[in-house]
Amino acid sequence: MENLALTTLLLPFIGALVVSFSPQRRAAEWGVLFAALTTLCMLSLISAFYQADKVAVTLTLVNVGDVALFGLVIDRVSTLILFVVVFLGLLVTIYSTGYLTDKNREHPHNGTNRYYAFLLVFIGAMAGLVLSSTLLGQLLFFEITGGCSWALISYYQSDKAQRSALKALLITHIGSLGLYLAAATLFLQTGTFALSAMSELHGDARYLVYGGILFAAWGKSAQLPMQAWLPDAMEAPTPISAYLHAASMVKVGVYIFARAIIDGGNIPHVIGGVGMVMALVTILYGFLMYLPQQDMKRLLAWSTITQLGWMFFGLSLSIFGSRLALEGSIAYIVNHAFAKSLFFLVAGALSYSCGTRLLPRLRGVLHTLPLPGVGFCVAALAITGVPPFNGFFSKFPLFAAGFALSVEYWILLPAMILLMIESVASFAWFIRWFGRVVPGKPSEAVADAAPLPGSMRLVLIVLIVMSLISSVIAATWLQ
């Protein structure tokens, strides 16, 4: 398993080098090839882990004396999230080969070596972060994802794109200071950077380590007060918005917080309390910011901020003893990644074909572009938690856990009621836009829509299927 894990981690970086020095006309082909090879290695790793009865393995790769600097953790959670980030990386790379062409009506632009190279580096960095068994390893890949996000958000090189990229880099880097604090404190208290050593922390050191990780998580996952970068990051090409801002980069914060909870053991309840309060505030504020949005990608960005808030709320609940909340939150990472990626790529399909992503200009999509129309419907129902789509099987465990804990912690009851109201209101708002955009007589922009390339259609079909079955995959794997 060690060799498979290392190969999965290193292949995207090797691919980025190959893409960088290849002729531009071959960049997309090399990008897809290395993303596919990485996916095959990832699936082989998961198969080997399954055949070993899913017994967790921790491997130290770099150490100085007894100090673990870098290592790998292969367990049910890391392999599940690895599947998400690598498989979606492949889908986004395939989608990009159709989207980044001169036939794109919104952005007629052929994909370059730079695009595919940074996308591959990002896939590798996400694999490295998910598999890291030390805080130092997490920190390294945390920073690499930040650098890649700057390069990819600014890809079109407009003034607005460059400002948005710099804003994302600065805010997420401010968040990373929390991870530096956590790593330094962990080392000073335990003599190692291993995540497993967090269970040995006592006294004030616990607050510094877990508080630092939570602060870093807020920055990377666009939670209040560091949410401002994500809506502006929609200047990126839409496949990048789908991968970075729905499936991978924004999940980094949630994942490192979840990993700390899994490995930490005795976490101060004040960390859980602060996490819940800030998550609740983010969810409610994010919903209010839905209301004025007419740009489909900005609407989805604010939706992502609220959905990430749900994940932080569930993880914070788990600190008070709810195993159901922990597993529900991890499943939420998986299910939201597929459903929201679908939604973003539907937005990309509409902008490619119609030349706009402004919702008031889109009508009658189902008549002219049936596949994006179906995708819009499935994604809207999935992210708002309607059965039988995957989002329902993420939200329901969090509601069950929250109401169960409210018997012991009465303050949770009004919080859960507020979350129920937000959930229903969010459903109503997306159904409102669905009714305006998908059925009816096609608007001028939609009536004149160009056909979608086969690569884009293929990815939309796969994501529609995954929006139905990913919850089954997550629940089965975590058992």
UniProtKB/Swiss-Prot annotation:
Pfam families: Proton_antipo_M, Proton_antipo_N. Its main location: membrane. It is a multi-pass membrane protein. The keyword Transmembrane applies. Keywords: Cell inner membrane, Cell membrane, Membrane, Oxidoreductase, Transmembrane, Transmembrane helix. Its EC number is 1.-.-.-. The keyword ATP-binding does not apply. InterPro entries: ND/Mrp_TM, NU5C-like, Proton_antipo_N. It is found in: Cell inner membrane. The chain crosses the membrane at residues 3-23, 30-50, 55-75, 80-100, 117-137, 168-188, 208-228, 238-258, 270-290, 300-320, 330-350, 369-389, 390-410, 411-431, 458-478. One of its GO terms (cellular component) is plasma membrane. One of its GO terms (molecular function) is NADH dehydrogenase (ubiquinone) activity. GO terms for biological process: anaerobic electron transport chain; anaerobic respiration; ATP synthesis coupled electron transport; electron transport coupled proton transport; formate oxidation; glucose catabolic process. It comes from the Bacteria. Belongs to the complex I subunit 5 family. Possible component of hydrogenase 4. This is Hydrogenase-4 component D. The lineage of its organism: Bacteria, Pseudomonadati, Pseudomonadota, Gammaproteobacteria, Enterobacterales. The gene is hyfD.
